[in-house]
Amino acid sequence: MAQQTPLYEQHTLCGARMVDFHGWMMPLHYGSQIDEHHAVRTDAGMFDVSHMTIVDLRGSRTREFLRYLLANDVAKLTKSGKALYSGMLNASGGVIDDLIVYYFSEDFFRLVVNSATREKDLSWITQHAEPFGIEITVRDDLSMIAVQGPNAQAKAATLFNDAQRQAVEGMKPFFGVQAGDLFIATTGYTGEAGYEIALPNEKAADFWRALVEAGVKPCGLGARDTLRLEAGMNLYGQEMDETISPLAANMGWTIAWEPADRDFIGREALEAQREHGTEKLVGLVMTEKGVLRNELPVRFTDAQGNQHEGIITSGTFSPTLGYSIALARVPEGIGETAIVQIRNREMPVKVTKPVFVRNGKAVA
């Protein structure tokens, strides 16, 4: 039996089409995925992300533990509330999960991890935390709502009290603050400004209803996927998994190589991969009729005349741009064009950076 978030009833009241998403009943859309997508790009939309797992870590050696556990370096986090994005790797350099970590104090950090990898993540974190004496608290008492879009912060702020409005005033991206019973973070998965707000389960439904009344459009998993793909953001299980290096998933920027003496899980394997080279993640654009879909082959000939093949990891029609886009994992040496096999047709595609839309505008 699939689990339900505390907002399940609100979704049905809003007319959602519900689907099983990694063991959770979640809204796919509320009538029109395209309208929901455009609402986030032009105004304000919201997503129930209560299926994601919030994990609080406490103990005097928490920073030391996370510097070992994660490929990115929490030594960078010195201001309370600051967050960073990181891969959590296995010994062979594969990605167990990608996550966000928040720093509150030397003995208190918070992780937000994916729902699909929950049990695996918790087992891995618990196993490696033991020698460091870390107290682990899974915050199943909290729901989470992502409010995203150019008007999202202003509309969400109409629900905040004076202290909460003051707490978020001027807050830069990738920060989080506990203000009363709300944890408000300037993070998201759409390429737009917004907040991800964690709050007690029993208060989630009222907050959702108030956001609807404030003019924030409920959005489902369908729009969440097209928005994140336009923004060039990875989806675990597609762009990366335990067999794929972060270097092959456009996550090289999340690996803190310095200081050279910091030992983190997967470092040795990554150093070997960096030396020998890996595949890379690129963007693909197809302006001709048709849709680039997951797992279609991508073929190209390199400058030496050698033929290579990669694979589309995520593909869709872009509602913002009006044509098809994709992320693809390909061998090094790809040029500015490639061929994608769609059924029995060879379709030309343009190779781009793996990001297509930022703040509602096409990335040239």
Curated annotation (Swiss-Prot):
Gene Ontology annotations for the cellular component aspect, listed alphabetically: cytosol; glycine cleavage complex
Gene3D superfamilies: Aminomethyltransferase beta-barrel domains (3.30.70.1400), Aminomethyltransferase fragment (4.10.1250.10), Probable tRNA modification gtpase trme, domain 1 (3.30.1360.120)
Keywords: Aminotransferase, Transferase
Cross-referenced InterPro entries: GCS_T, GCS_T_bac, GCST_C, GCV_T_N, GcvT/YgfZ/DmdA, GcvT/YgfZ_C, TrmE/GcvT_dom1
GO molecular function: aminomethyltransferase activity; transaminase activity
Its EC number(s): 2.1.2.10
Keyword Kinase: no
EC top class named in words: transferase
Keyword Transferase: yes
Catalysed reactions, as listed in the record: N(6)-[(R)-S(8)-aminomethyldihydrolipoyl]-L-lysyl-[protein] + (6S)-5,6,7,8-tetrahydrofolate = N(6)-[(R)-dihydrolipoyl]-L-lysyl-[protein] + (6R)-5,10-methylene-5,6,7,8-tetrahydrofolate + NH4(+)
One BP term from GO: glycine decarboxylation via glycine cleavage system
SUPFAM superfamilies: Aminomethyltransferase beta-barrel domain, Folate-binding domain
Subunit record text: The glycine cleavage system is composed of four proteins: P, T, L and H.
UniProt cross-references to HAMAP family, sorted A to Z: GcvT
Function: The glycine cleavage system catalyzes the degradation of glycine.
NCBIfam families with a match to the protein in the record: gcvT (TIGR00528), PRK00389.1 (NF001567)
Record-stated family: Belongs to the GcvT family.
Listed name of the protein: Aminomethyltransferase
